[in-house]
């Protein structure tokens, strides 16, 4: 099987809703105002604990506090559909979301204040089933109960349609069980409400589910089906995965559905702060990885991707100072 060559990806190897978002935004605003007299305070809006992005935000917050002298608050929200406009409005200083979610949010809501910091790491994902079942491929999901809807992560449905398309399936071919976000979908899976859930590799929740149900399996995606998938979502690709503690559920070398995870801010954040954020995470990668193994894929060059969202001037200066050119999609 020929997978896209990803030298950076090998670094991964290791030896409801709206109301909740607004409440979180209010709490964050109070925190930021109370800290105005302090040195520097940043709020990082992310998803709920147990998600890949929450762990990533926690790692970044720790490094920024310990290495860059910044006071940082990690602010969980219901999902990426909340995080992006929250950050654009300046109610959070930094946000983390996948590239598709960012593209759609900007296209639909005209978030003119949103500014990109960079692509922090690839986002490898999968449909997971119980290891005790005979289900092994995406085609086996036909007629099964599968998480769907994702009202707080609206673009996940687009990704799921792309993955189903690799085996000639559509959402109509599965029994859809509506959930607000991936964490709730995993909880429903544990409770027996669905046959398959969708999540990113490296998230603590995946490890938790694996231990709770006695083992899970990542469903295989046929490379031949990627042409059909790209008609749904052009930026998705298969990246190599092998059995190891990061890729829980991978039983043999296979390709896993992947795209980029982005770090972004807004136009009101000072240039020197954004510059300091990038400089700190690049220089202290080893510290980040102790908390979030997915950040093994982080590189200064990898941050600077081509995207429809404009870069923050602080990021532009960092890339210019370090002679880092822009690259195309992975």
Specify the residue positions occupied by each region the protein language model found:
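N-terminal secretory signal peptides that target proteins for export/translocation
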Residues: 1-16
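Sec/Tat signal peptide C-region and signal peptidase I cleavage site
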Residues: 33-39
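Bilobed "Venus flytrap"/periplasmic-binding protein-like clamshell domains
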Residues: 40-67, 72-73, 123-191, 285, ...
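Extracytoplasmic
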Residues: 69, 79-82, 89, 112, ...
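Acidic, polar ligand-binding/catalytic clefts
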Residues: 88, 92-122, 204-207
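Pocket-lining segment of extracytoplasmic ligand-binding domains
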Residues: 98-101, 108-109, 133, 170-177, ...
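Ligand-binding clefts/hinges and TM-proximal coupling segments of bilobed small-molecule sensing domains
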Residues: 151-162, 237-307
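An extracytoplasmic/periplasmic, membrane-proximal ligand-sensing/linker region
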Residues: 183-184, 191-192, 200-218, 223, ...
């Amino acid at each position: 099987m020929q997978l896209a060559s990803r030298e950076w990806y090998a670094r991964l190897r290791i030896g409801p809703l709206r109301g909740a978002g607004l409440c979180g935004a209010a709490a964050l605003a109070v925190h930021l105002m109370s800290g105005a007299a302090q040195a520097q305070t940043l709020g990082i809006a992310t998803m709920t604990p147990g998600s890949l992005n929450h762990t990533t935000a926690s790692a970044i917050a720790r490094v920024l506090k310990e290495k860059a002298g910044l006071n940082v608050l990690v602010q969980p929200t219901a999902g990426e559909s909340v995080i992006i406009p929250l950050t654009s409005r300046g109610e959070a200083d930094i946000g983390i979301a996948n590239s598709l979610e960012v593209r759609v949010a900007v296209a639909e809501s005209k978030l003119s204040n949103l500014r990109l910091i960079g692509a922090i790491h690839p986002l490898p994902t999968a449909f997971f089933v119980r290891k005790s079942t005979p289900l092994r491929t995406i085609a086996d999901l036909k007629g099964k109960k599968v998480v769907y809807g994702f009202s707080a992560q609206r673009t996940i449905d687009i990704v799921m349609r792309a993955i189903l398309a690799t085996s000639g399936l559509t959402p109509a071919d599965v029994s859809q069980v509506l959930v607000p976000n991936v964490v709730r979908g995993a909880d429903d899976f544990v409770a027996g409400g669905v046959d398959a859930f969708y999540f990113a590799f490296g998230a603590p929740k995946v490890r938790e589910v694996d231990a709770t149900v006695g083992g899970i399996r990542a469903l295989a995606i046929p490379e031949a089906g990627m042409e059909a998938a790209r008609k749904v979502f052009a930026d998705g690709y298969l990246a190599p995965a092998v059995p190891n503690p990061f890729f829980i559920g991978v039983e043999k070398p296979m390709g896993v559905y992947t795209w980029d995870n982005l770090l972004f801010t807004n136009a009101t954040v000072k240039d020197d702060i954004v510059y300091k954020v990038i400089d700190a995470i690049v220089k202290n990668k080893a510290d980040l990885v102790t908390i979030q193994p997915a950040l093994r894929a982080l590189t200064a060059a990898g941050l600077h991707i081509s995207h429809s969202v404009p870069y923050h001037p602080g990021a532009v200066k960092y890339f210019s100072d370090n002679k880092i050119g822009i690259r195309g999609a992975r």
